[in-house]
């Protein structure tokens, strides 16, 4: 327990909340370059091969980002736009790649939830 004199000399520091997406540096999205594109297995009750990419951001961070949707065209040196948003069954994956921008093409034949995958409205 500090004395009153110690508290006058050095006030208590407020506890700061940690940012959930520190690599974005307060921006809504960041551009980055894929360093590696690979698959990983999800946590226990789930089973799949989830597509992820190791991305070097313009903020200087290297992060693991999830590639949403069915099928993708990403490879090493692809330029992508990254947003925050974790994937619950992939530990350490706290970012997602935005489909339909830069080098990440939109998901084909997507009818519902198109805005999340960069898909255009289908012609009638």
UniProtKB/Swiss-Prot annotation:
Single GO BP term: translation
Signal sequence coordinates: none
SUPFAM superfamilies in the record: Nucleic acid-binding proteins
Subcellular location: Plastid, Chloroplast
Keyword field contains NADP: no
KW rRNA-binding (keyword) present: yes
TM ranges: none
Keywords: Chloroplast, Plastid, Ribonucleoprotein, Ribosomal protein, RNA-binding, rRNA-binding
Lineage top rank: taxon: Eukaryota
Role, per record: With S4 and S5 plays an important role in translational accuracy. Located at the interface of the 30S and 50S subunits.
Matching NCBIfam families: rpsL_bact (TIGR00981)
Protein name listed in UniProt: Small ribosomal subunit protein uS12cz/uS12cy
